[in-house]
Regions:
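Membrane-interface alpha helices of multi-pass inner-membrane proteins
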Residues: 349-352, 357-371, 383, 402-408
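Transmembrane-helix motifs of polytopic, lipid-linked glycan transferases
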Residues: 76, 227-284, 324
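Short acidic/glycine- and proline-prone juxtamembrane loop motifs at membrane-interface regions
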Residues: 146, 307-317
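Short hydrophobic/aromatic helix or loop-helix immediately within or flanking a transmembrane segment
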Residues: 154, 166-233, 635
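Membrane-proximal stem/loop segments at transmembrane-domain junctions that anchor or position
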Residues: 161, 166-185, 421-557
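Membrane-interface anchor segments at the N-terminal boundary of transmembrane helices
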Residues: 221-231, 235, 520-615
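Transmembrane signal-anchor helices characteristic of membrane glycosylation enzymes that use polyprenol
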Residues: 7-18, 118-146, 156-160, 404-416
């Protein structure tokens, strides 16, 4: 059922694409037979992919019997013809072809062994990533947009305040950093402060301090920004190498096997999850050369990963720390042992995380928390799931997940409540609702009742809201921007009590204008789940943004044209049908969702527990301010190769168990009675 729902959602997002590409007149009311055809075809393709994955895992025939039989007969016919004496010339030709095939296979096998040998240690993988990415910070220096400029500005104002410069909220400083996004004035503490949690306060302080030190030494922010980009690239090297080492080399296998031997083998009837884990223990420790090549090729060649290494935009930092975190979860599930005697399964002692993995678990959790405000929701859910699935290692999850969350998230909340910093405006979380109201105000203003207008009048200027509406981005509706902007959101005068009837007004507007409201929702998020949709903001945007190419001090003069050529190439590549899909995040989002559906069908609950964060990240995409914003898809894209490898390994394990069961049953039936 869940698989069908996933396919229906993906098919809907694919089918409505042509409708919403018409920004002015697009609406689901214009649905026609073409959209129906897209919907049916997409649904069939997505469901077919899930069926193929499920049948492969079950050891069943992937291709229909008629097709596989035809291919088999064609191969047999070719072999028979090759054996006919009258076809001696053909035999010689086929022999030469076979030799060439054998030579090619031998060379590929040798290449695979060399790739494996060159990536079978953490330090080797780190060296590959470092060399492969070295050209990025050395030729492009850094990539950034408006966010880091705001963070630097915030820290500068806060630093001036800390060092004794009086900066009241009014007068000459009437338009301050908190007015840019903006944050409602009622949230500002009575004692003026200019440090906010809009861009994650820890990052704001760190980035701002580095930029301030850069200004002290060089007179501009540029050197500090370049240093931050280089540091992020090194962090990306470390995170990706650590996780690749865990997935490709599984260095804990020796420890797990010795623990298993010490405690005895499991016997009796076992669940599918446990039996697959047991069979996987017997699988080769190292991944093959092909898997290594494809995973490394993605990280070293895909624009998503390449440009993210130097993009100082919060999301890449979260994405790389998430990759690190994701790898530790894989180690935890691979070293999971059953608890107690259930279904005839003998209990074994739990395998504790090695010290370096435990420290990595704590640090990756901390970096996630300081780089994305929604990280604590993901971590909180994982704490609950982990304590249910693996409660014998509860101390690991409490120390590595719960304590960092309490310290970082709780500390920031305490600082906000004490007035030391300014929290984020609650309006930020209402992007979907705002887009619905704004689209109705733009397309059918008469459809808003007088009561709804009255309930919204103290919060929004509906005329300005209609003018500011963009189906791709909710930020203009929230009055984000510098002074020359539409004042849709009355952040200067709104009070908490003014929001009391907001939900009531929103519901009434949606009830009176259901089609327009549905348009607003779909137009805001369909691109994340439609592989044919081009990104609203791609990762190459930050490489050639005006903040880099025009408004920087000296970065703009360094390889200016080279940046334009590189981004021009990646944009051209991304526009090529099918081939260009692999350069965009929505391809990896769609495929990850399909793999997750297949895992549900195969009941791989332990693996699904570690993949739940990917589903939550897809929910973040739907509620994000903009449609098809590639930086929000980075975590899912970065771990996609590891998700595929996990599914492949567990499928082979299940097939092995099925064959063993069939062999055992066959042996039993042939024994004399």
């Amino acid at each position: 059922m869940l698989a069908v729902l996933a396919c229906l959602w993906l098919a809907l997002c694919t089918a409505v694409g042509p409708l919403y590409w018409d920004f002015e007149n697009g609406t689901i009311a214009n649905w026609n037979w073409t959209n129906t055809a897209f919907f049916v075809l997409s649904f069939a393709i997505y469901l077919g992919l899930i069926v193929i994955m499920v049948r492969f895992a079950a050891g069943q025939r992937v291709l229909p019997r008629a097709i596989s039989g035809r291919l088999s007969r064609a191969g047999q016919q070719h072999s028979n013809q090759a054996l006919e004496p009258s076809q001696s010339q053909s035999v010689v030709a086929d022999s030469n072809v076979s030799k060439r095939h054998a030579t090619a296979a031998s060379r590929f096998a040798t290449l695979g062994r060399w790739i494996t040998r060159g990536t079978n240690r953490f330090w080797k993988l780190a060296l590959v990533f470092f060399i492969g990415w070295l050209w990025v910070p050395t030729t492009l220096l850094a990539a950034f947009g408006a966010d880091i400029r705001s963070q630097i500005r915030e820290f500068s104002w806060a630093w001036n305040q800390w060092t004794g410069l009086q900066q009241p909220y009014i007068g000459f400083f009437s338009f301050v950093p908190m007015d840019i996004y903006p944050t409602a004035h009622y949230m500002w503490p009575p004692d003026s402060t200019y440090l906010t949690d809009q861009h994650n306060v820890v990052l704001t302080v760190f980035y701002g301090a580095v930029a301030a030190f850069s200004r002290y030494l060089t007179g501009s922010n540029d050197a500090g920004i370049v240093a931050l980009a280089a540091g992020q690239m090194l962090l990306a090297v470390f995170c990706c190498a650590a996780t690749a080492n865990r997935f490709l080399n599984r260095p804990w296998m020796g420890v797990a096997q010795s623990t298993k031997d010490k405690n005895g083998s499991s016997t009796g009837n076992v669940s599918s999850t446990t039996s697959a884990r047991i069979a996987q223990d017997a699988a080769p420790q190292l991944a093959g050369g092909r898997a290594r090549f494809l995973i490394l090729a993605f990280f070293l060649c895909c624009p998503l990963a390449v440009f993210a290494t130097i993009s100082i935009t919060k999301s890449p930092l979260f994405a790389f720390s998430f990759v690190w975190w994701f790898g530790i979860w894989y180690e935890l599930t691979q070293t999971w042992k059953p608890e107690g005697k259930r279904k005839g399964l003998t209990a074994t002692a739990p395998i504790r995380l090695p010290r370096h993995s435990f420290v990595a678990f704590v640090l990756s959790t901390a970096v996630m928390l300081i780089s994305a405000k929604y990280a604590w929701y993901i971590i909180a859910l994982q704490i609950v799931l982990a304590l249910i699935a693996d409660r014998r290692r509860w101390t690991t999850y409490v120390v590595a997940l719960l304590i960092p969350t309490m310290l970082i998230h709780g500390g920031i909340s305490l600082a906000i409540s004490s007035g030391a910093i300014i929290g984020g405006d609650p309006i930020e979380s209402r992007g979907v609702q705002l887009q619905m109201i704004a689209r109705v105000a733009s397309r059918n203003p008469e459809g808003i009742s007088e009561e709804a207008k009255k309930n919204l009048s103290d919060v929004f200027n509906l005329d300005q809201m209609a003018d500011a509406y963009s189906q791709q981005d909710a930020d203009p509706v929230k009055s984000s921007g510098i002074q020359a902007k539409k004042v849709s959101y009355k952040w200067r005068t709104v009070m908490p009590e003014d929001m009391t009837n907001f939900n009531k007004a929103w519901f009434e507007i949606v009830k009176d204008n259901p089609v327009i409201a549905l348009d607003a929702l779909l137009a805001k998020c369909f691109g994340y789940f439609n592989v044919t949709d081009q990104p609203y903001v791609s990762m190459d945007y930050y490489v050639t943004s005006d903040y880099v190419q025009k408004n920087s001090t000296w970065i703009k003069s360094y390889n200016h044209n080279w940046r334009e050529r590189i981004t021009g190439f990646t944009r051209s590549w991304g526009k090529i049908p099918v081939i260009g899909w692999i350069t965009h995040g929505n391809f990896y989002v769609v495929m990850t969702l399909l793999i997750g559906a297949a895992e549900v069908i195969r009941r791989r609950w332990l693996t699904l527990m570690t993949h739940i964060p990917l589903l939550l990240l897809m929910g973040v995409m739907i509620t994000a301010p903009a449609n098809n914003f590639e930086r929000h898809m980075l975590p899912v894209a970065f771990v996609f190769g590891f998700v595929v490898l996990t599914y492949w390994r567990e499928s082979l394990a299940e097939r092995r168990i099925a064959r063993q069961a069939q062999s055992s049953a066959s042996t039993t039936t042939t024994l004399p009675q």
